[in-house]
């Protein structure tokens, strides 16, 4: 099953704190990074390993290292930036591809306004990070872009997801695995995830939050 709802106690606890409406920008931002790191741990569990040797304090030691898998982290602007440092804390050597996708608040349709992708995407695992998977429009636009550029292995890391967004992604891209801290109930009339987290971008950057 390509949908992974990670119900680890640490993730459940941290996500519960993030749902508080009175949480400070600083705390929300820090928790976004922490949950992003925990999702990265789950999403990278099957990376291949190869044996190598290092000189240890008592002589040569056989160790394991990640083998032959280049990684690019793909934050969807702007809210995806809030999860980026959490991912890089575990995979510091990953290259970063940046994608800007905006949603029309009337039609809820996504349009791309920025594309800065790293090279050799055909040899890379792409980890897309975005706090919210709501209608799926931004995620679909990003996946489409990566595949056009030659990327063959894509995983999405989101804090909360709505069933309609998950279905939209899997209907078009059944090969993409989705890792989320929570599958929430659905969307309200404005396209916000319920109960969700509110506007994650506003909460991460401390800008004015839109009414739901």
UniProtKB/Swiss-Prot annotation:
Taxonomy, superkingdom: Bacteria
Catalytic activity, reaction form: UMP + diphosphate = 5-phospho-alpha-D-ribose 1-diphosphate + uracil
Binding residues for uracil: 193, 198-200
Biological process terms in GO annotation: UMP salvage; uracil salvage
Cofactor(s) listed: Mg(2+)
InterPro entries: PRibTrfase_dom (IPR000836), PRTase-like (IPR029057), Upp_B (IPR034332), UPRTase/APRTase (IPR050054), Ura_phspho_trans (IPR005765)
GO molecular function, one term: GTP binding
Record pathway: Pyrimidine metabolism; UMP biosynthesis via salvage pathway; UMP from uracil: step 1/1
Family annotation (SUPFAM superfamilies): PRTase-like
Pfam families the UniProt entry points to: UPRTase
Activation/inhibition comment: Allosterically activated by GTP.
Cofactor note: Binds 1 Mg(2+) ion per subunit. The magnesium is bound as Mg-PRPP.
Keywords, in A-Z order: Allosteric enzyme, Glycosyltransferase, GTP-binding, Magnesium, Nucleotide-binding, Transferase
Documented EC number(s): 2.4.2.9
Amino acids binding 5-phospho-alpha-D-ribose 1-diphosphate: 78, 103, 130-138, 199
HAMAP family reported in the protein's UniProt record: Upp_B
Family membership: Belongs to the UPRTase family.
Protein task: Catalyzes the conversion of uracil and 5-phospho-alpha-D-ribose 1-diphosphate (PRPP) to UMP and diphosphate.
Protein name: Uracil phosphoribosyltransferase
Biological classification of the source: Bacteria, Pseudomonadati, Pseudomonadota, Betaproteobacteria, Burkholderiales
